[in-house]
Swiss-Prot record:
Belongs to the ClpS family. GO terms for biological process: protein catabolic process; proteolysis. It comes from the Bacteria. Involved in the modulation of the specificity of the ClpAP-mediated ATP-dependent protein degradation. This is ATP-dependent Clp protease adapter protein ClpS. It comes from Cupriavidus pinatubonensis (strain JMP 134 / LMG 1197) (Cupriavidus necator (strain JMP 134)). Binds to the N-terminal domain of the chaperone ClpA. Pfam families: ClpS. The gene is clpS. InterPro entries: ClpS (IPR022935), ClpS_core (IPR003769), Ribosomal_bL12_C/ClpS-like (IPR014719).
Length: 108
């Protein structure tokens, strides 16, 4: 004889359960931003933009001039993990080269 467990809901034969559609949100995006300082050479900033952000020389120069004139410039917009990785790579490279260049991420 089969026993029924107490407090366990029983389904009728032929009942079809509907699967609820999951609404996935796009990931949060972050801007990677270089901050101006009076010591890091402009050519080093251009090299960083080319090496870590795949910018051509002309675009890298324009971003570098924005950093110089306005105090900061956006290098690119990425998901959180990619942005954090780029910030760490740039900061480490600048530190190893003896430059005080700062790179931060901001919510886009």
């Amino acid at each position: 004889m089969a026993t029924r467990l107490a407090n366990v809901p029983q389904r009728e034969a032929g009942t079809i359960l509907e699967r609820k559609e999951q609404q996935l949100k796009p990931p949060a995006m972050y801007k990677v931003v270089l901050l101006n300082d009076d010591y890091t050479p402009m050519e080093f900033v251009v090299m960083i933009l080319q090496q870590y952000f795949s910018r051509d020389r002309e675009t890298a120069t324009q971003i570098m001039l924005t950093v110089h004139r306005e105090g900061k410039g956006v290098c690119g917009i990425y998901t959180r993990d990619i942005a954090a990785t780029k910030v760490e790579l740039v900061s480490t490279h600048a530190r190893q080269a003896g430059h005080p260049l700062q790179c931060v991420m901001e919510e886009a």
